[in-house]
């Protein structure tokens, strides 16, 4: 296993050195005894920028070597380790291409970090509505026709931001879209958080990096054996991206005390993927994935659901199941949790499971029987099919950001909110996609959906008054 950073950390730990440096646990010497047995092995490599351990913000040794190995594996011009998750990668890539007042094209069902980056940049977003799959009732990809319409209307846009795959593992062929954007000289920035394993090839979807995207950010911690917050940012060889600006923003936005355990896990995750490829382990892993899927397929009161659109490729690591007995996804998720099966997310209709890329996890027949019995005896609750994701394929906010920020705000009841201008992001989490964004006009349908989600006890990020059925709205000039 060629893991230069991890190896250097282990070598340092074996020296049994005397720590007179941060962090304050001093190699685990200062720690609660009750927790020490759990944390102890990790604390020995939770160090700082010591001799031989390099510096993430100016790599010249083992971190540089580890990043270069990741770049070689993924075929990028350069790869960066991220210790603040794909969130920091999304922030850096968008800030690197935008200035205040610039136009940027953004897929509407992106993660909240994308919209936060746009807001911080001062750019004016143009939102691109995705298709909604008729079988799963979730947003998928932005169709080529919508992309072309946006490019023709905004040929001077500074970037096109896409999410591929979606949280549900739905991936589209972006080749034509990327080619079209490049025809206008517009860089394509892709949040590929759920696709760090796509480098393994079929039957997994193709990575946006291979399809020619200019910057791709991946959450290694989502599908690879990396610690939470460990991600990669990949730069393609491109004249459309200023590499130094990307690096500068990563230096500004990432912690000045990056976690060595997280960085080491990124080194190990890359080596794990490389091992699968070099040792031809993929067929065995796929068989284990299929066995797990067959286990859930044996449920008589639930079923797997897949997109109706034949152009959508579903990641084999994602499994979406739905009750056959009229339960919402939230109720089905609770039933699974009572059987000690904890899933990634639920929505109004279904539950999403993220399957492991390897491992030995098995679910026995007794657990499946208990789940079936629970589904059968749990009273059904009405399921709601999501409406379309927007009336127009290409939209802009009613007011520029500068004008919005000049408006005062007030709280109004849900009943009064329709037609008003929303003043904060309303985000069901997970998946972290804003349902209503600050600056968007609130519709009657969105208020109704938010009411349903709250009644289902869905976790919604926003101010605490949402639970009291109040929304923060802007006071527009004509209403002040």
UniProtKB/Swiss-Prot annotation:
InterPro entries xref list: Orn/Lys/Arg_deCO2ase_major_dom, Orn_Lys_Arg_decarboxylase-I, Prn/Lys/Arg_de-COase_C, Prn/Lys/Arg_de-COase_C_sf, PyrdxlP-dep_Trfase, PyrdxlP-dep_Trfase_major
Classification of source organism: Bacteria, Bacillati, Bacillota, Bacilli, Bacillales
Keyword entries, A-Z: Decarboxylase, Lyase, Pyridoxal phosphate
GO molecular function list: carboxy-lyase activity
This protein's record includes keyword Lyase: yes
Protein name listed in UniProt: Uncharacterized protein YaaO
UniProt entry tagged with the keyword Lyase: yes
Domain of life assignment: Bacteria
Cofactor(s) annotated in UniProt: pyridoxal 5'-phosphate
Organism expressing this protein natively: Bacillus subtilis (strain 168)
SUPFAM superfamilies: Ornithine decarboxylase C-terminal domain, PLP-dependent transferases
